[in-house]
Design a protein with these regions (language model features):
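Catalytic cores and adjacent flexible loops of soluble metabolic enzymes
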Residues: 1-303
């Protein structure tokens, strides 16, 4: 395998991982969890979402979490921003980076944010302009890239058209999301073959869910194409409220463990990462799906 020497892991657990959990984690516990994640060496954390609390009650305390964080200057603390109101709240908390999102599928876009792709792009263009003016970098998520619960397969051309728009607005990186976890390595190859004719691998991140257990295989295929940035969630938490059947994100614990075994460095301490998983599992009172955590949790707890 010809693989890169280093990969960047963007931790999305505090936002994507917690947004669907029925049990709401308290603000102080979220702050402590984020601190454990950064102490483990994660240099990028998506802290929360400035979405209306009515839609995502689990993240209603986004402003409080940001104001209580003791920020490490070497860490990027990002937030998901759905609209103008969310952007103003994000500015008040001086977030390091603004994340915007839309779906490659019209149906999922309608279901998720009640907008057409065209309408969503107009909102994103406006947010990006304002955020850039304020000196904030903007990152874009495109969801359902590899399949939609309503429309099935999504064409690489449709994804390309959206990416083209996002890059034209000044978005520095697009995270390609397998929202319902249906991607396989062949499909990843097909999408990247298409996109990398036109764009550089450094402009993309991959965001895999593990519904069918193929997330890590998809990561390896992406690495072969020179992709070096991956979104993941501590312990494998997460799903999508508007994507029926979606399971958790690829677990940061599993991803880091595999990368290290493949000789790809991350600057993340696996043992400290397991402590972060152990902490959030105890607060949610659930069994985390991470394979590495399950295999090693007793070893971690016994120390």
């Amino acid at each position: 395998l010809k693989l890169p020497n280093f990969a960047v892991i963007k931790e999305v657990g505090p936002r994507d991982g917690l947004q669907n959990e029925k049990k709401i984690v308290g603000t102080k516990d979220k702050v402590k969890w984020i601190q454990l994640l950064t102490e483990a060496g994660l240099s990028y954390v998506e802290v929360s979402s400035f979405v209306h609390p009515k839609w995502v009650p689990a993240l209603a305390d986004a402003s409080d979490v940001f104001s209580e964080l003791k920020r490490d200057p070497n860490v990027t603390y990002a937030a998901l921003v759905p609209n103008q109101n969310g952007l103003e709240r994000a500015f008040l908390q001086n977030v390091d980076e603004v994340n915007v999102f839309l779906s490659a599928s019209e149906s999922h876009n309608k279901s998720n944010i009640n907008k057409s792709i065209k309408e969503a792009l107009a909102v994103i263009e406006d947010i990006t302009k304002q955020a850039t003016f304020e000196g904030k970098k903007v990152r874009g998520y495109v969801s359902t890239v590899f399949g939609c619960p309503y429309e099935g397969d999504i064409s690489a051309t449709a994804v390309d058209e959206i990416c083209n728009q996002l890059f034209s607005y000044g978005i520095y990186e697009v995270s390609l999301g397998d929202t319902i976890g249906v991607a396989n390595p062949l499909q990843v190859e097909q999408v990247l073959e298409h996109l990398l004719k036109k764009y550089d691998a450094s402009q993309f991140a991959m965001h895999f869910h593990n519904t069918y257990g193929m997330a890590l295989a998809n990561v390896v295929k992406s690495l072969e194409y020179g992709i070096t940035t991956f979104d993941s969630s501590c312990g494998g938490l997460g799903g999508c409220p508007y994507a029926p059947g979606a399971s958790g994100n690829v677990a940061t614990d599993d991803l880091v463990h595999m990368l290290h075994k493949l000789g790809v460095q991350t600057n993340i301490d696996e043992e400290k990462l397991l402590r972060a998983s152990q902490f959030i599992q105890s607060k949610l009172n659930i069994q985390l799906p991470s394979h590495v955590y399950r295999a090693l949790q007793h070893k971690t707890i016994s120390r």
